Amino acid sequence: RDSTWTTWYKNGNKKFLATYINGKLNGKYIRWYEGGIIKELDGDYLNNKKHNKWVSWAKNGQKTEEINYDNGVHHGSHINWYGDKNDQHKSFHVNYKNGAKDGDWHYWYASGVDSLKSNYLDGEKDGHWVWWRKNGLKDKEGFYKKEKKHGVWTIWNDSSGIAYHKLHEET
């Protein structure tokens, strides 16, 4: 198969479009909801593997997810959203490098309040990490170095707001 294939719903609206070269998915791939106007999924393939940015939408047209690939491997940002069109905010925004967790990772509660900010380096916990409670108050904070807790960690008491500290030394 060497061509762009399009399929249709019974109502005449486009269902999906896919490009093939030498029998493999290569190029644009788009899938629509039955109404035919709102996309469900849009991305590219390279030799049957997801490539570049892939975007997903909900039936109401709201963008729900963006994922970046390099020849089938997570590479770059991956973002997911909560909510409806009137109150849309991120669920998470994370990063990959050649399939490994890398860089800033940020999660939010459904309310939009921060849940976790963290850092990775080549797939390992490395750098500053902060957790929050659903009410927006910090829960704990510290550093990782090559997957291990490092330095002073601060943990806050639920009710009094009083913090205590714990030192993690290199082993």
Across the structure, where does each feature detected by a protein language model lie?
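Glycine/tyrosine- and acidic-biased, solvent-exposed loop/turn segments at the edges of beta-strands
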Residues: 1-171
